[in-house]
Amino acid sequence: MACQLDLLIGVIFMASPVLVISPCSSDGRIAFFRGCNLTQIPWILNTTTERLLLSFNYISMVVATSFPLLERLQLLELGTQYANLTIGPGAFRNLPNLRILDLGQSQIEVLNRDAFQGLPHLLELRLFSCGLSSAVLSDGYFRNLYSLARLDLSGNQIHSLRLHSSFRELNSLSDVNFAFNQIFTICEDELEPLQGKTLSFFGLKLTKLFSRVSVGWETCRNPFRGVRLETLDLSENGWTVDITRNFSNIIQGSQISSLILKHHIMGPGFGFQNIRDPDQSTFASLARSSVLQLDLSHGFIFSLNPRLFGTLKDLKMLNLAFNKINKIGENAFYGLDSLQVLNLSYNLLGELYNSNFYGLPRVAYVDLQRNHIGIIQDQTFRLLKTLQTLDLRDNALKAIGFIPSIQMVLLGGNKLVHLPHIHFTANFLELSENRLENLSDLYFLLRVPQLQFLILNQNRLSSCKAAHTPSENPSLEQLFLTENMLQLAWETGLCWDVFQGLSRLQILYLSNNYLNFLPPGIFNDLVALRMLSLSANKLTVLSPGSLPANLEILDISRNQLLCPDPALFSSLRVLDITHNEFVCNCELSTFISWLNQTNVTLFGSPADVYCMYPNSLLGGSLYNISTEDCDEEEAMRSLKFSLFILCTVTLTLFLVITLVVIKFRGICFLCYKTIQKLVFKDKVWSLEPGAYRYDAYFCFSSKDFEWAQNALLKHLDAHYSSRNRLRLCFEERDFIPGENHISNIQAAVWGSRKTVCLVSRHFLKDGWCLEAFRYAQSRSLSDLKSILIVVVVGSLSQYQLMRHETIRGFLQKQQYLRWPEDLQDVGWFLDKLSGCILKEEKGKKRSSSIQLRTIATIS
């Protein structure tokens, strides 16, 4: 046990990564000089060096002085030298604690007989593919290697296994490999120094043993007499039935736990009869060898003959995989009372009968995958009372009436379209890669008693034609439904209760089911669910409450999630959300912030969590996107909503008030004026004193006097009422009788702050009115300010107004007032007219930048 532990430690030392060491350097413990073009052992080594790696160099000589004293060195790698190697006597004596010496794939031109002396603690010696001859075994090269446990001499030029007597001293030797040599025979006297030893492995793979020469079996006798072998590897030697039988005869009585005869040529194969299949006598002599494992895989056996293994009472594992077995003879397995594992995979079996497996009272595992089995009799496996695992994957089965009540049934890769509702129990049921379509089969399987693991990947589950009774299965722990078409079933509104009653389910796979939504409450009963895979579907959104409450691991990768809510993932321990189609706008800022702050373990590379929109951010990692511009918007989101409500209400009220005001504008204006008078009741209206006698000269046709007096003058002129505030001038009252009419007009225009022309049909026909209009325009030009106010009265159109040249010039440049048609607007109009009269107009300064020049006169 101590030797095996030391060997394990040595292997660990060798396999440890050296990537942290710079090439052609040493860190004190590891000296890494692989491929450094060295021609000799470097002397710059530290005495603390434990591993020295010198492969792939040009070192051609190793002698006693090649190494400094390295008492801690445990691994020396000198393999694959590009120069022929000469190893002198005591070449490694300065490495007293060496555990592993690797010289493999170096062409050793000279190997001194004392080359390995001084290595009392050596556990493993690798001399594979070194060009060594049989002399390395017969001349005592391995003397005094008392700790040697593993010797690898594979791939050399050894033709004889005649061992030197010093092998008797190698009490720790347990693993010897002579594979890939040309050793045509082995006889009893050659391995005599190994008698009394127990070897864990003895390799003779591809040595052409007994297959190229005529062997005197009686004189050669048992080469393994007195040797106990745990594993004897005789594969790829081209053994026929006769060679196998003769070898079994000469080694009878030798204890061999595992016999490997892979890649043999026993059996005719399919369609041939020139080579015999093994029969009852082939392995009969192994009865006293206590063989526990027999590997006959990769051959050409076509038929398993009756009682073929009848004498192998102790056999526990039989491997017949990769043959051409098409027929199992009657009682072919008779006598295998202890067999536990039977491997018949990768053969040509087409049907199985009730009698095929008679004689296997303790078999627990039967592997029949990758045959062509299309039909099985109902009682074929039910007679195997201890059967625990039945592997029938990748066959052509269309029915499962034969299923026994066992722990594990593997039926993936068959042609099952419908499952008969038979009664059976199982712990593990695998039915992937079949042709199941109706979810009624899923409901049936979920009711199988004691079922803990159910695999239905890569079927066609898509149909749900009727309501089903929910499955009550308190034992199911893992359910795999990857690569089906559940979307087609669920979009009809049926089978939403398929997971109801699965109270102990812990793992659920729903990947690749074309799901674009999750039915409401689909996971409500999965109170124990810890892991859920929804990857590779078409989900765009996950609704709050759609995930199980106790979920810890969620795979939602390769969907079409746009803006997921991070609150859904806050209770998870592990999350895979890679390869989705994220829309990178401010709505995603909360999720981006969560990604950078969460304690949830996120699977995948950050580069796999990327934007799909907008195009400016296409392919950019969410981890690299700044959300600073969105912080203010996020903080103001609730305020914005409140403002939205406020604005909506305000706008509605405004529209209502506007409609009311428009409808009852006259009343509203009167109320406004009343309030204004109440507010300013203590203030006396006073006009700024100035040079004007009147506030306004009202010019109108005498034919319009009655209307003007009733509509305007009584409401504006202070002489009519003390409540009026304007001093008005008009012809009928204020013109001086007998005075020149032009003078009166001129005095009225120039003596008033503003001139108001009431343009009506009579006005346009009255010459004096038009003359007063021209005087007012003349004053406007003189004072460089607008003192003319035009009020259009009646139904005069724009065309009628523009016909008069005097009026046209004003209307093209100035605004005018029109007497309201609705009586409720009269008050507002009078107020506006008063405001226009009282409004002070600032005159424009005359430009002084215009230079005048004298124009020559022509006489």
Swiss-Prot record:
Residues exposed to the Extracellular side: 27-641
Ranges for domain TIR: 692-837
Mutation effect (residue 482 to A): In strain: MOLF/Ei
Matches recorded under Pfam families: LRR_1 (PF00560), LRR_8 (PF13855), TIR (PF01582)
Consequence of changing residue 226 to D: In strain: MOLF/Ei
Subunit architecture: Homodimer. Interacts with MYD88 (via TIR domain). Interacts with TICAM1 (via TIR domain). Interacts with UNC93B1; this interaction is essential for proper TLR5 localization to the plasma membrane.
Protein name in the entry: Toll-like receptor 5
Species whose genome carries this gene: Mus musculus
